[in-house]
Every structure is written in structure tokens, then in C-alpha cells.
Amino acid sequence: MAKASFGFPAAALRAQALGEVHSRPYALVTTPRVIFQLAFITEGGSIVDHAVLSELSRARGIAPPGRDANHHAMPWGQGTLRWERHTEFSTYFWDAPAPERFGGEVPIHPFGDGFSPPGLLISGIRLEIRPDTPEAREAIKAFDPTSLCYSETKNGQAVLLTDFRQNGDGLTQILVLDRGMTEAGTGALVQRLLDIETYRTLAMLGLPLAQSLSPEIRRTEDGLTGVTQRMKENVREKADEMLAEITRLAAELEAGAALSLYRFGASRAYYGIVQERIRTLSETPVPGYETIGTFLERRLAPALRTCQSVEERQANLSRKLARATALLRSWIDVELERQNSALLNSMDRRAKLQLRLQQTVEGLSVAAISYYVVGLFGYLAKAVSHELPVDPGVLTGLAVPFAVIGVWLVVRRIRRHHEEGAHK
């Protein structure tokens, strides 16, 4: 057992699976401390983030992260700058010693003029951890009392205060009063609070889209109602026109549904993360104040229900449009079958008429050809009349039935030959 034991071949993804649980370690946070976290929507993916981090790394004289990296940390000033890549956004976290008073200026930080944002800012947070002292509690006055969330957590080891409003820098301010937490416990609490603020903002992105889609869905519903009312009047001669209108309405609906599919799904996922983080806070309410959980639930839940309602309206309307389309197509198919039947009957009548005409022409042809044949026979009889004991006129008359029968047989044989060739 001195050598490396159990050295079996490992599955291809084993190392990645084992390392995933350690990919987001909590930062060890001391008290007092101020933390800034900015979240950016990054449409360019990690390429843009890598360019920003490479520039910051060169300025600090350290190696930049690898191109495939999803997280990176570097020393910056009196703290650490941490970057993490998520599905549609990236976060930049930096901590430093807290200023003398809550909300005080932090003159040196990595997000100054030399910082190139990788995308549009979606969330900005300033979180301060301070010892629970009478001086620190004076900071309660800095929050808006109409939306102040004030609670205890970690069995009374910490006090949480925030009003979810933004300061002059556009950052949501959060104050944590420390009553004896460990550095690891403080780091875990800080990460939960940062996640709650970041993901609750992302979860709300679906609401403006839902509000913009609602009038469009209403117009589509009204359009469908108009078409179905016309269908109820049994105006089948306008089925093509109504089908075109239904198709246009369905195209508009599907365009909106495709636009909202990802956003609504992401909002549900982000809302689930917020709810999970709130549960892990295990807040104890302070009498007279709301907890973070109850405050956000009262505001996030209606927004998510609005998104869900729009999704359900889209799905129901899509089914109604499909049923109306199927009914109109059945009308059109029945009308096409009726027209085809009428066309076939007309073609059948035309074929019968053509056959009678052909038979008439054949009869006339037999008479005409027989006439010429008899005439030729008459000329022949006259030419040899001096050698015949019978009058040429009598011979010509006797030749008439034979000529007619012979020509008729020839014409019949030719027609039968043509019919057999057509069937092959």
C-alpha cells in the first residue's frame, strides 16, 4: 500500500465532476469589510471577459486566466478581485477594508477609469460587514424605512439590513452586523446575499417582456375571435381568406413565443435560485420589519405569475389557432373535392360527347370512303364494259354493299389498334 493505491483508469468526466463542487468556494471574509460585486450581461461570451481580465492582469503584473477558464482570482489593492463566468452574465467581486462609516467613499478600487466593462451592467451591490455596535446601528438611518428589510440570521449571529434601493453609484446597499461569525460563515452568508440580489434582478427581466407581449397576445386573441365568428356564419366561400388571416396570426404568435421562450425559462430558474438562497438564510424577523424573504416574495411572485400567465396564454392561443386552422383546411379540402368531382364529371361528359362525335365522324368517313371506292369501281367497270356481259351500272350498284362493309371493317380494325396502343 506504499504506492498510490486504487490507481484504476478513471472515467473521462470524473475529474470535472469531482471538481465542480469546489468550483465556487466561499471567500473567507473578515470584519469589518466592504464588498463590491458587479454583474454584466455578456453577449460576447467569455472572450470579452478574457480581454478585460488580461488587461487587469497585465496592469498588476500577473498571468491572465486561461481562455477556457470560468473563474479567476487575483490580488488587487488590499483585497482580491474575483471573476466568475455564468451562462448569460459574469460577475466581478472585490473586497477591501471597510471605510470608517457605512457608505463612506472607497477611493481606490478596480472598477475605476481603467476598467472596461465586458457588457451592460445588470446588477451592482455594495455590501458591508461591520461589528454589531451602537455606532454601526446608526447606519439604519441611511435606509429607506418604507422598504427596509431588517432580520437576524445564523441563530442571531448576524443582523441583515437592506432596502433594495440603489445609492448614488447605482449600487444596492446591504449591511451585515456581525455578532461573532467565523470567517467561513461570513463568507457563506455574503455569497448568499450577493446571489439573492443578482438573481432576483435577473429573474425580473422576464416581466418587461411579458408586459410588452400581453397587448400583442390580446390582438391575436381578438383576431382569432373575429375569424371564428365568421366561421360560425358558415361563410365557406371565404375559407381561403380566413385561412390566410389565421396563418398570419399564428406567425405573429410564434414569433413572440420564440422570443420569450428562453427569457421566461431563465426567469423561472433564477427565481428558483433566489428562493433556495432565501431558505438557507433562515431569517428571524425583527418585530416591526420585513425579512428579505417576505419582501422579495411579495414582489417577485406576482412578476413570475405574470410571466407564467403570458406563457399559458401563448400555449392556449396556439392550440386554438391550430384547431381553427384544421377546421378551415377541412372546409377547403371538402371544397376542393367538390370541385374535383365536378371537373371529373365535366371531363366524363366531354369524353362521351367526343366519343359520339368520333363515332359520327367515323360513320361519315366510311360513307365518304365507300363513295370514292364505288366511284373508282364504276370507272373500272366502264373501262372494261365491252368485254363484260353485264351493264357497268349494275356492277357498280352491286359493289356498293361490299365497299361499305370492307371500309367499315378497315376503319374498325384501325380504331381497335389505336385503342390497344393507348392501353399499353
Model-based region annotation:
Residues 250-374:
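Membrane-associated alpha-helical segments
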Residues 1, 158, 168-170, 178-191, ...:
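Hydrophobic alpha-helical signal-anchor/transmembrane segments
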